[in-house]
Amino acid sequence: MENVVSLQNVVRTYIMGDNEVRALRGVSFDIEQGEFVSIMGPSGSGKSTCMNMIGCLDRPTSGIVKINGRETALMTEKELAVLRNKTVGFVFQQYHLISAMNILENVMLPLKYQKVDRAVRIEKAKAALEAVGLGERIHHKPHELSGGQKQRVAIARAMVTEPKILLADEPTGALDTETGKQVMEMFRKINNEQNTTIIIVTHDPRIGESTERCIKILDGQIVTE
């Protein structure tokens, strides 16, 4: 199987005033196409910095980050933006839905940025919402939905571009336990049916245990995987 994510001895250092903060201290791991993985650690462990590396939102101070075979440190900002748009779908704890738009329009938005024809955008967005069980609610606005339904819209929006990697940051953090389980089942279904690589960043051991593989990070270093 091909590696869609590869981190090799990655160090990320930030300068904060007079202090140097090492968020990542020589992190190495590979993730293959089709894996269902969690990156787990407490606040300040470096897991969010790992997410930023995988999502092409940041570059390493040293070491190598490869996404879909391409080394991010060697890419221009424009090339990184294209890689993000076409290869990675993002799901966050906060849903980031646009309140003035109905959910169909929200899900269509990433395709608009890709300059996809409107008729195709509508067709793909409807299919994505159908896949997450919201095909009957396409004209509803976000405020008319429950928290779990909003997160399903966010998942549909992330999947509408058919990314190789779905990157989710604490996706169940704002949900009750039962709704959180349903969202995790949705991720598992996408992973099984579409062979999408799913990477969930979490502090919650229950989420870590529910994925096929759990990469644990503490103080900027991998402690187990």
Predicted features and spans:
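ABC family nucleotide-binding domain
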Residues: E2-I217
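Conserved switch/coupling elements of ABC/ABC-like ATPase nucleotide-binding domains
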Residues: D219-E225
